[in-house]
Design a protein with these regions (language model features):
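Peripheral, non-AAA+ core regions of ATP-driven protein-machinery
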Residues: 357-366, 372, 378-385, 389-391, ...
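Conserved ASCE/P-loop NTPase catalytic core
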Residues: 2-441, 446, 452-464, 468, ...
Length: 817
């Protein structure tokens, strides 16, 4: 690779390359107040297209999983987008639960056009209330009393005839039969007259036994007549019941006629009304209430209470009421428990026993969203495993079955009911992270069958004119909706630049709008304190500084350790086998760069590169891989004509918490080359970058934090104008450095070099060209590669002689044999 003496000048970045400054001069607005509120979302074309496909496919299984990071606006957008689709779709039906009069453990579901359920409930209630009075009035009417009197006369006549027959037989045994309130009773006679109590008590044993014997004979001979009396009594009761039912049926049918005509097109309503009328007629006696009985007998109060409870069977449960909707529902369930999703059966406790009926059936989000769209957060529903399983079962079965979970875990028994399942026709949208999606896709068998559409939200968007304007409109919308001060144009530009810094890419904007909105809220408090009408760029900068100040306690503690010399680091001078590497530390909300001294010792041996971090189990697998790549590079570069025989121990000094990643692999390689060649490295320059076996520099992460971290240390120890950072050229697009660092570069007090190959880096660090392999297979004398190659020959020379001696000994042994 050809390298000239101006390589530092060629590879040094200009100040304008360190950050892309947003200019809004082409836009006509002065503040975000001049802009319309954003409609839709910034970017996310892929996610929007997938969402559109999923929402418009109405087949089973085409539910949607929205994968994106929290704070990206995914939930708000999905909610709004679903509503935009739903507004063109019809309002689903109302649902009413009613008692199943054929099977008291079941309930029936009645579906009606939206808004009709309340009307049905009101009219059924009015009809029942009217019937309770109307039936009572009819059953105290002269018509009813006359009909009942005729039945009673016939009953008495038949009873009298049988009674006369009984007395004929009774006279033979000195007994007489009389009608009483308790029925027909037998009375012993004495001289043809009813026996008095005194006469009864004075009976001798013989007389008593004789009377007893006569009574038994009479009982046998009169059995048929008593059966006749019982049949007469039964016929009487049946006649009264028939009278009541006949009259009741006529009254009920007449009073339900109008209601039946009104709902004649709804078969489920007509079917229910038929069963309702039949049940009323069947229990017509419950409607015939004698208020005098209650007044005369206080104990009848309890019976009256039970009677009132009886009429609960005719009430209706307004299960789903869509009367207020104008289109298909969009339900966002924030607490998707089993009951909140699939509904529940509540209960009352009487004497320690749980009781329930159809009136206590409560709907769930699936019922309210039926015919439309249900939105839930994955983290919420997966934290309720019963709810997740219940949702999947409902989607697979295409119906919602309401069950009471509490009965399985309660010490009380509960009256059980079985609500009729509701047919399910809706679209479910689950919002989660990509990680949750992959877990479900790999480990949940039903997930792929039920959620066939994935809407993938990016973490970043292109930084183009369209999205910049969208960002400004988002800011306008957020300020307007939350009654905050609007932003001046320079404040918007500042946020655009910070948005790029959040994703460490000049060509991108963050999709994490929650952070942007939080900054606006905080900046508004500063603007309020300063009594300005709008938020300006200074307010944004102060906010960012305050946010960093809140979270950088650990970083400041690290800086103090560098300042007082606890951490050893040279930012000037030159040393052999020592170099400053760069790492990124994170405390959750805050990430920052921390320089680390890396040292290498080389000596004779065959161990190759000894990674001390690995030996003490302080390095991760990726870092270990990076170190092994170094051996590959050295072998590729210097061991084509000889064995690579040397030992180099490499360590991150004063590192006690472990290390992971390969971003320091090029840094380690420079230190090895310096140690082997015996050439000093400029300690003013810190290095970051990965390297492959061919010496090509590869990009890394956290470039802004690393550069700023080393800059802060140099500032602490004193800027000299020679300090800087060497980085991969591929990371130039990721540079969004703070203005302070950019100004230092502009003033010539700090430098940043972007390289693509190890040969470029070693020349910048040592001032000596790397040297390219010539035609004779040698490196030019005086170059780094020449010095390294010569030293490796020297380190491996004893091993070569030893190998030759061993070969001679083997040949001598063969000749002796």
């Amino acid at each position: 690779m050809g390298v000239n003496m101006t390589i530092k000048d060629e590879l040094q970045l200009k100040p304008e390359e360190l950050k892309k400054c947003c200019s809004l001069d082409a836009y006509t607005f002065e503040t975000t107040k001049d802009l319309e509120s954003m409609v839709g979302i910034i970017g996310q074309d892929r996610a929007r297209e997938a969402l559109d496909v999923g929402l418009n496919i109405k087949k089973k299984g085409f539910n949607i999983f929205v994968a994106g990071q929290w704070g990206s606006g995914r939930t708000t957008f999905v909610n709004e987008y679903a509503k935009s689709i739903a507004k063109n779709e019809p309002v689903p039906e109302d649902i009413v639960y009613a008692k199943d009069f054929q099977n008291f453990h079941n309930t029936i579901a009645i579906r009606l056009n939206a808004g009709r359920a309340k009307d049905l409930i009101d009219k059924v209630y009015e009809t029942i209330s009217f019937l309770r009075k109307e039936i009572q009035n009819h059953f105290i009417s002269k018509e009813y009393e006359n009909a009942k009197k005729q039945i009673l006369i016939e009953h008495k006549k038949e009873t009298k005839e049988v009674l006369e027959e009984l007395n004929k037989i009774g006279a033979l045994y000195d007994f007489e039969f009389k009608q009483s309130e308790k029925g027909i009773v037998s009375i012993p006679l004495s001289d043809g007259e009813p026996m008095s109590e005194e006469e009864y008590n004075n009976l001798t044993d013989e007389e008593y036994e004789e009377m007893k014997e006569n009574s038994e004979k009479l009982q046998v001979e009169s059995a048929d007549l008593f059966n006749q009396i019982r049949n007469i009594e039964k016929d009487y009761r049946d006649s009264i019941d028939d009278l009541n039912k006949s009259m009741g049926e006529r009254i009920v049918k007449y009073n339900f006629l109008e209601l039946r005509n009104e709902y004649s097109e709804n078969n489920s309503v007509i079917k229910y009304l038929d069963a309702l009328q039949e049940d009323i007629v069947k229990h017509i006696n419950e409607f015939i209430n004698n208020d005098n009985d209650v007044k005369d007998n206080p104990m009848m109060l309890f019976k009256n209470k039970d009677s009132e409870r009886f009429f609960d069977r005719y009430k209706l449960n307004l299960f789903v009421d869509n009367s207020e909707l104008k289109n298909a529902p969009v339900v966002f369930e924030t607490n998707p428990t089993f009951q909140n999703l699939l509904g529940s059966i509540e209960f009352t406790v009487e004497m320690g026993v749980k009781k329930t009926d159809f009136r206590y059936i409560k709907n769930g989000a699936l019922h309210r969203a039926n015919g439309g769209y249900l939105i839930v957060l994955a983290k919420d529903i997966l934290s309720n495993p019963f709810a997740w399983r219940g949702l999947k079962r409902a989607l697979l079965d295409e119906e919602i079955t309401i069950e009471s979970m509490s009965s399985s875990y309660s010490v009380f028994s509960a009256s059980s009911i079985k609500p009729e399942p509701i047919a399910l026709d809706l679209k479910v949208i689950v919002i989660g992270t990509p990680r949750i999606y992959h877990i479900l896709a790999n480990y949940d068998e039903e997930f792929g069958k039920l959620f066939k559409i994935r809407s993938d939200f990016d973490q970043q968007n292109d930084r183009n004119d369209k999205n910049i304007l969208k960002m400004a409109e988002f800011i306008s919308k957020y300020c307007r909706e939350n009654e905050l001060r609007h932003l001046e144009k320079d404040a918007v530009a500042h946020l655009i630049d910070y948005s790029s810094r959040m994703v460490a890419n000049k060509k991108k904007l963050t999709a994490h709008l929650k952070t942007i909105s939080d900054i606006i809220v905080e900046a508004d408090t500063i603007a309020n304190r300063e009594k300005t009408d709008f938020i300006n760029s200074e307010h944004i900068e102060k906010t960012l500084n305050r946010r960093e100040r809140r979270d950088n306690k650990y970083e400041e503690a690290i800086l103090e350790l560098f300042e007082d010399g606890t951490y050893l680091l040279d930012v000037s001078g030159k040393k052999v086998g020592e170099i400053n590497g760069l790492a990124v530390l994170s405390t959750g909300q805050h990430s920052f760069g921390k320089p680390n001294k890396i040292t290498v010792s080389t000596y004779k041996g065959k161990a190759g590169i000894i990674n001390i971090e690995r030996e003490v189990r302080k390095s991760g697998s990726v870092h270990d891989k990076g170190v092994l790549i170094l051996e590959g590079y050295l072998g590729y570069k210097f061991a084509q004509d000889k064995p690579l025989a040397f030992t180099a121990s490499i360590v991150f000094e004063q590192l006690y918490g472990g290390i992971e990643g390969d971003s320091a692999s090029s840094t380690e390689l420079y230190a090895i080359l310096s140690s082997v060649a015996g050439v000093v490295i400029n300690q003013s320059i810190a290095v970051t970058g990965s390297v492959n076996q061919r010496g090509e520099i590869q990009p890394i992460g956290g470039i802004n934090e690393k550069i700023e971290g080393f800059y802060k240390i140099c500032k602490l120890k004193g800027l000299t104008g020679n300090q800087g950072v060497m980085m991969p050229i591929q990371n130039v697009k990721n540079l969004t450095l703070k203005d302070e660092v950019i100004e230092a570069v502009r003033d010539g007090m700090f430098s940043i070099y972007a390289i693509s190959h190890i040969d470029e880096g070693i020349e910048i660090l040592t001032g000596i060209p790397a040297g390219e392999l010539e035609e004779d297979g040698q490196y030019p004398e005086g170059t780094i590669n020449y010095l390294v190659n010569e030293k490796l020959i020297e380190l491996g020379s004893d091993d070569t002689n030893e190998t030759e001696d061993e070969e001679k000994d083997e040949e001598q042994s063969d000749s002796d044999e």
